[in-house]
Regions:
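Absolute protein N-terminus
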Residues: 1-2, 287
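A structural preference for short, hydrophobic beta-strand core positions in alpha/beta folds
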Residues: 34, 102-105, 157, 198, ...
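Structural beta-alpha unit
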Residues: 41-45, 50, 72-124, 223-266, ...
């Protein structure tokens, strides 16, 4: 059976990812592994010696002991929080009839823990921002690009609001990771029966290479049973794609994480985070 690895932090973005996972799991005939990672920095319990150095050598023993006790309590609270978040995830999947759910709690750093479980996963899911999204990029958000860069599996980056997936937009530039995404798209049962749009953005509307890439994607999509709407549009990839998503009411964007044309700027460097954070729909990326 296929496995979906869902990274959660209990935030509103993570809640949305549960709904997308519940939609995808039966279409992929997949189980769901829900991973919560407690930041190791919040679990380190200080000794009285360490604390005396930080608050002054003359601090009373009673005060130091109280501070150590508080550190222990904090570690317990963090553990309890993880337990509650994972149990909430299980309860949600129970209500959706998803029975094959595995809860995983690790202490460390998300990027490091993620590698341990990625090998058995077929698809990675995480929210595009984390628990501190109201104030700054949160835990998941801060790790998002590192995970996308490091993952050997397709990554579904979910938006805050769940939107039923009805229309797909595949942004294709012919790059190697785009070809992997094309192969995943045509082979996966997840997207069968959905409306598919294929978009290639070029510097010129009559660019022969861009036309060839679009023809390739269209032919493979048709062979897989899709009836794709094809578009070749001249312009800036980020602006063109964002406008197309809005205009056509697209519910899922698919693209390679690396390309060999200007489309690569969508997912390399600072523009990646900006696009993913500003997107109101989920984005499926393939390295």
């Amino acid at each position: 059976m296929k496995r979906i690895l869902l990274c959660t932090d209990g935030s509103s973005f993570a809640q949305s990812s549960y709904r997308y996972a519940a939609w995808l799991a039966p279409r992929l005939n997949a189980g769901v592994d829900v991973l919560y990672v407690t930041d190791v920095r919040s679990q380190k319990v200080a000794s009285t010696g360490n604390l005396s150095g930080s608050i002054g050598i003359d601090a009373s023993k009673e005060l130091l002991n109280k501070l150590v006790d508080l550190e222990h309590e904090k570690a317990k609270v963090n553990h309890q929080r993880a337990k509650l978040i994972l149990e909430e995830a299980r309860q949600f999947f129970d209500t959706q009839g998803i029975q094959n759910v595995n809860l995983i709690h690790e202490t460390g750093f998300l990027v490091d823990s993620f590698h341990e479980f990625e090998t058995t996963a077929d698809l990675i899911m995480l929210g595009n921002r984390g628990e501190a999204a109201e104030f700054a990029s949160g835990h998941l958000g801060a790790n998002l690009e590192r995970i996308v860069r490091a993952s050997h599996k397709p990554c579904l980056v979910t938006s805050r609001q769940f939107k039923p997936i009805e229309r797909l937009l595949f942004a294709y530039d012919g790059g190697q990771s785009g070809q992997k995404m094309l192969q995943f798209l045509v082979q996966s049962p997840a997207f069968k029966g959905l409306e598919l749009h294929i978009l290639t953005v070029a510097k010129k509307a009559d660019d022969p290479e861009a036309i060839a890439h679009l023809n390739e994607a269209e032919q493979k999509a048709k062979a897989a049973g899709f009836k794709p709407v094809r578009q070749l549009i001249q312009g800036d990839p980020e602006q063109v794609i964002a406008h197309y998503v809005e205009e056509k009411n697209i519910s899922l964007l698919l693209m390679g994480a690396y390309g060999h044309s200007r489309i690569r700027h969508l997912v390399i460097g600072s523009t990646t985070a900006q696009m993913l954070r500003s997107s109101h729909i989920p984005v499926l990326l393939f390295r």
